[in-house]
């Protein structure tokens, strides 16, 4: 039996309104809103304003990270959401971003990361047998 340690969503968003992705304050608010909406835990963040247009930013999470890089002059934003906090939280963070940015087109890749074996817990009988050997 195996389990996946994390889920990674890479999304290219096209047809995003210029004003939604041009300013670093809006980009910061977007990612922080996604973190809160998904119930993720922020460790730190870094954001940068480009001139004449665009912004980039990343929030480091206890569960991994969420990032954005924008080209508002092309109506384009590259989004990266990777968490080990459960698939639901990863999808919720992306759902929030899509609701706010309302892209006309989305190209998305979803990857399960870190598939590892799951060891079953020994039953009570197996524990007794191991202790008496």
Curated annotation (Swiss-Prot):
Is synthesized initially as an inactive proenzyme. Formation of the active enzyme involves a self-maturation process in which the active site pyruvoyl group is generated from an internal serine residue via an autocatalytic post-translational modification. Two non-identical subunits are generated from the proenzyme in this reaction, and the pyruvate is formed at the N-terminus of the alpha chain, which is derived from the carboxyl end of the proenzyme. It holds the Pfam family AdoMet_dc. Keywords: Autocatalytic cleavage, Decarboxylase, Lyase, Polyamine biosynthesis, Pyruvate, S-adenosyl-L-methionine, Schiff base, Spermidine biosynthesis, Zymogen. The record marks 63-64 as: Cleavage (non-hydrolytic). Pathway: Amine and polyamine biosynthesis; S-adenosylmethioninamine biosynthesis; S-adenosylmethioninamine from S-adenosyl-L-methionine: step 1/1. GO terms for molecular function: adenosylmethionine decarboxylase activity. It catalyses: S-adenosyl-L-methionine + H(+) = S-adenosyl 3-(methylsulfanyl)propylamine + CO2. Binds 1 pyruvoyl group covalently per subunit. Its EC number is 4.1.1.50. GO terms for biological process: spermidine biosynthetic process. InterPro entries: AdoMetDC_fam_prok, S-AdoMet_deCO2ase_core, S-AdoMet_deCOase_pro-enz. Transmembrane segments: none annotated. The active site is at 64 (schiff-base intermediate with substrate), 69 (proton acceptor), 84 (proton donor). GO terms for cellular component: cytosol. It comes from the Bacteria. Its cofactor is pyruvate. It is an enzyme of class 4 (lyase). The modification Pyruvic acid (Ser) is found at residue 64. Heterotetramer of two alpha and two beta chains arranged as a dimer of alpha/beta heterodimers. Catalyzes the decarboxylation of S-adenosylmethionine to S-adenosylmethioninamine (dcAdoMet), the propylamine donor required for the synthesis of the polyamines spermine and spermidine from the diamine putrescine. Belongs to the prokaryotic AdoMetDC family. Type 1 subfamily. This is S-adenosylmethionine decarboxylase proenzyme. The lineage of its organism: Bacteria, Pseudomonadati, Aquificota, Aquificia, Aquificales.
